[in-house]
From Swiss-Prot:
Pyridoxal 5'-phosphate binds at G106, Y107, S179, D205, E206, A207, H208, T236, F237, G238, K239. GO terms for biological process: biotin biosynthetic process. Belongs to the class-II pyridoxal-phosphate-dependent aminotransferase family. BioF subfamily. Its cofactor is pyridoxal 5'-phosphate. The gene is bioF. Keywords: Biotin biosynthesis, Pyridoxal phosphate, Transferase. Substrate binds at R18, H131, T352. Homodimer. Its EC number is 2.3.1.47. This is Putative 8-amino-7-oxononanoate synthase. It comes from the Bacteria.
Length: 380
């Protein structure tokens, strides 16, 4: 035990020790240690998670005869229910693709897809800043991989050219909206690059984009009009869609490969049907939420401008707004100060972000008002 204790002490010395907070949620507010704070750290981008009208409308349609609260098994055994197929068909239809497949979480999706679709003779080329879950999936793939410089497509092209013909298949892996900087990948350029090389597939994680961007809330791929050109388009239900789970839209042949070879899918008890029914209910309504998307973008543009004015740094183009302070100590102190003023802001430190870029990750939601954001800015 002494070795584990020493590890924790080392983390504390570097201001990198983490703990799970005790929280009480009250709509867009958080109660912590008897302090009520506006939640500036949530991924509930459309503000749906505490929408009581939506919740009541969903519950009333069942009249007490609710879907099962557990699947009790993997979908490949006895854990499949009609609502799973209903949701997969709805997602595929909305994206105008052949098929969709559900997963228990975005993490399950990202650690399972690449190992299922690659061989030891494959190559993965991933953006330097992809999420930890994608990195874990790459490591589990046991094939060759390189990380290209963040959003540097000339570097990516050089890696594609250098390795052309050497591997049985190549996967380009990126997020659309990056979770810590809030910047956006150029999906059109990535599609163009992919098409220049044979046996090359594009895998895009839209976790922080689905619901928020695109005319129908289908993400950056919809906004860029490239949905049909992305081989594996992953999204999550646990952020803007106020639910749990994830999906991939892809060709039917890839779906069948995942069903047969993806270990996190095969060996996990499936999501509760009740949860999947709620997801279906929310996903049906995505096209109707344009007012929320427009309001969120107005809030985001204002906050990005104000933070950039103070720090001279603003990589973001989205509702994820990094307030980059640099060192751990300054970031921890500022987060504490903002919490004392009534704003639940959390410090993000290495190894989550590169050394010297510690920041407060500000995350806006559509149920906030412009006055609330202006009052927050006055505290910066």
């Amino acid at each position: 035990m002494d070795a584990f204790k020493q590890q924790l002490e080392q983390l504390s010395a570097k201001n990198q020790y983490r703990s799970i907070p005790d929280l009480v949620h009250q709509g867009r507010y958080i109660m912590r240690e008897n302090r009520k704070m506006l939640n500036m750290s949530s991924n509930d981008y459309l503000g749906l998670a505490s929408n009581e009208n939506l919740r009541q409308s969903f519950l009333q349609q069942y009249g007490g005869n609710f879907p099962s609260f557990t699947s009790s098994s993997s979908r490949l055994l006895t854990g499949n229910f009609p609502i799973y197929t209903d949701l997969e068909e709805l997602v595929a239809q909305r994206f105008q693709r052949e098929s969709a497949l559900l997963f228990n979480s975005g993490y399950h999706a990202n650690i399972g897809i690449l190992p299922a679709l690659t061989t030891t003779k494959s190559l993965i080329l991933a953006d330097k800043l992809v999420h930890a879950s994608m990195i874990d999936g790459i490591r589990l793939s046991q094939c060759e991989f390189f990380r290209y410089r963040h959003n540097d497509y000339e570097h990516l092209k050089s890696l594609l050219e250098k390795n052309a013909g050497k591997f049985d298949r190549t996967f380009i892996v990126t997020e659309s909206v990056f979770s810590m900087d809030g910047d956006v990948a150029d999906l059109k350029q990535l599609v163009q690059l992919k098409k220049q090389f044979s046996n090359t597939y594009l895998y895009v994680d839209e976790a922080h984009a689905v619901g928020v961007y695109g005319q129908n809330g289908l993400g950056i791929a919809e906004r860029a009009n490239v949905i049909a050109d992305i081989d594996l388009l992953v999204g999550t239900f646990g952020k803007a869609l106020a639910s749990m789970g994830a999906y991939v839209v892809c060709d039917q042949i890839l779906k069948e490969c995942l069903i047969n070879q993806m270990r996190p899918l095969i060996f996990s008890t499936a999501l509760p049907p009740f949860n999947v029914a709620w997801t279906h209910f929310i996903f049906e309504r995505l096209p109707q939420l344009s007012k929320e998307r427009t309001h969120l973008e107005q809030l985001s543009a204002f906050l990005r401008q104000e933070v950039e004015h103070r720090t001279q740094i603003m990589p973001s183009q989205t509702c994820i707004v990094p307030y980059i302070l640099g060192e751990n100590e300054a970031t921890l102190a500022k987060a504490k100060d903002l919490q004392e003023q009534g704003y639940y802001c959390l410090p993000i430190r290495p190894p989550t972000v590169p050394k010297g870029t510690s920041r407060i990750r500000l995350s806006l939601t559509a149920d906030m008002t412009m006055d609330e954001v202006k009052q927050f800015v006055a505290c910066l």
